[in-house]
Regions:
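PP2C/PPM-type serine/threonine phosphatase catalytic domain
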Residues: 1-242
Length: 242
């Protein structure tokens, strides 16, 4: 099995008082995640925490690395987190609307599997080319796919932050599952929109291509987002394949 190295960090940014993002890395269980809370300060932060804890619980104590098992565990983690968020809202009605976006990347014996919901993203840098693997679950993405707006209009669109999928939104989480082969020298990026709203893809690609250490790349991406305005919490997780 190829070796992997992980690095990650979350930053409150320059405009927010609290951080509703979360990330977690488990080298032993071969997974990493990023989440971005929605629904207000304390509630959003708690939703991201619930997703993190639910994933840790789901992956702990199982050594089966088959693709089938990893896919099952990802689905289970999303369902458990969704159930726990909805249960919390039932018990705490003032937190109605609480939820989070979620990215979960796990490596199996055959390659990688991604669970995705919301507008956080997972990218892969392969052979110097950066590819966005996930599709945003947003109003503007729907409009773009329907040919009703052009990509250059997204950043200025008044409804650009409207998401139609997140954990805690419906009884059954509508996640996307993606899988593929993991090749030597692949570099996976999981991030919240605090990065991608501030830093264009070509600049992200150039930082990921650079020869600096993986931990320094995380720092560089976050600092670049802050230099561009740092309007939101910023979370960056990298997984390098060797």
């Amino acid at each position: 099995m190829p070796r992997r190295k992980f690095a990650g960090k979350t930053d409150v940014g320059l405009k927010r008082k609290n951080n509703e993002d979360a990330f977690f890395i488990s080298p032993d269980q071969h997974f990493c995640l990023a989440a971005d809370g929605v629904g207000g300060a304390a509630a959003g932060e708690l939703a991201s925490k619930i997703f993190t804890e639910s994933t840790i619980e789901t992956f702990t104590g199982n050594s089966d690395r088959s693709g089938k098992e990893i896919k099952h565990r990802i689905q289970k983690a999303f369902r458990l987190a969704n159930d726990n968020i909805l249960k919390h809202v039932t018990q705490n009605p003032d937190h109605k609307g609480m939820g989070c976006t979620a990215e979960l990347l796990a490596f199996s014996d055959e390659g990688f599997i991604i669970g995705h919901i919301g507008d956080s993203r997972t990218y892969c840098l392969r052979n110097g080319q950066l590819e966005q693997l996930t599709q945003d679950h947003t109003f503007v993405q729907q409009q773009l796919e329907a040919g009703l707006i052009t990509r250059d209009k997204i950043k200025q669109h008044p409804l650009r932050n409207v998401i139609f999928r997140s954990l805690g939104l419906t009884k059954e989480p509508e996640l996307d599952l993606l899988k593929g082969k993991a090749c030597p020298e692949d570099l996976f990026l999981l991030c919240s929109d605090g990065l991608t709203d501030m830093v264009p893809d070509d600049q992200i690609r150039d930082i990921l291509r650079s020869g600096i250490d993986i931990h320094r790349k995380v720092e560089e991406l976050i600092e670049t987002a802050k230099l561009a305005g740092g309007k939101d919490n910023i979370t960056v997780v990298l997984a390098a394949v060797y």
